[in-house]
Amino acid sequence: MVFSSLPVNQFDSQNWQQQGNQHQLECVTTDQNPNNYLRQLSSPPTSQVAGSSQARVNSMVERARIAKVPLPEAALNCPRCDSTNTKFCYFNNYSLTQPRHFCKTCRRYWTRGGSLRNVPVGGGFRRNKRSKSRSKSTVVVSTDNTTSTSSLTSRPSYSNPSKFHSYGQIPEFNSNLPILPPLQSLGDYNSSNTGLDFGGTQISNMISGMSSSGGILDAWRIPPSQQAQQFPFLINTTGLVQSSNALYPLLEGGVSATQTRNVKAEENDQDRGRDGDGVNNLSRNFLGNININSGRNEEYTSWGGNSSWTGFTSNNSTGHLSF
């Protein structure tokens, strides 16, 4: 393999040593004075000096110095806030006769012979930003607290049951509704001694309360003079109650007249065996005194009186219970 670009004698080791010795001799002869070598390194080429001078001349400050334009005085009054806390920034890039100034008070630039900048440059300092953000957050929290307290004061707290002694104290709940009777008579719907904390009411009281409070039955009232003419078969019947205002039908099922006697007889027994929660007494009062009179003569009495099913009689031929 032959390299045409390199001479053959360079591959000999003796020739390499001779060339190295010659290079060292040349360095010693040329560099006898080391100061000359440092001067040569420190001095840039002439082309570089010309290029750097050209770049300096291109700056506006250098052009102003070459043109012998005096620098404007530093303490100029700001045309916006009339403050003397101003400084000279630089000349205009297009004209040396328009220097640009900056006001440290209102943080705005202005150019001589030009317009004033209305928008402040940059934001506030970081310290001022933090203080402002904290103050804003506290203001927001305080406003939230005021709104929450105002809303709590304007609306009653429904979690406290002590405020429900009377419904009239609640501003959003009106007891005189047109479709309901007065709420004072709601506790009268059952007979006494049921083991609960409210008494009973009558249906007539409920109807009278509905008619007096809301007046929704006014359109359905029948004058007394027309009752005998239009409904002669409804007068003096057991299923209707006649009043001066209207005829109101009562809801009556298949309960016999002996129910009232049995209820009175069972009141003393229920007082003796009354439990703490009142649930058993409620079931006794409801189920223990029902007489079902049908064609098969089936009678169910005294359920739950003393927790025993006594008095059960049946005349059914089949002999099994039927409910």
From Swiss-Prot:
This protein's record includes keyword NAD: no
UniProt protein name: Dof zinc finger protein DOF3.6
Main location: nucleus
Compositional bias segments (type: Basic residues): 126-135
ZnF Dof-type: positions: 76-130
Xref: InterPro entries: Dof, Znf_Dof
GO molecular function annotations of the record: DNA binding; DNA-binding transcription factor activity; zinc ion binding
Inducers of expression: By auxin and salicylic acid (SA). Repressed by jasmonic acid (JA).
Free-text function comment from the UniProt entry: Transcription factor that binds specifically to a 5'-AA[AG]G-3' consensus core sequence. Enhances the DNA binding of OBF transcription factors to OCS elements.
Signal sequence annotation: none
Database matches in Pfam families: Zn_ribbon_Dof
Binding site for Zn(2+): 78, 81, 103, 106
Keywords: DNA-binding, Metal-binding, Nucleus, Transcription, Transcription regulation, Zinc, Zinc-finger
Localisation per UniProt entry: Nucleus
Biased composition (Low complexity): 136-159
Taxonomic lineage: Eukaryota, Viridiplantae, Streptophyta, Embryophyta, Tracheophyta
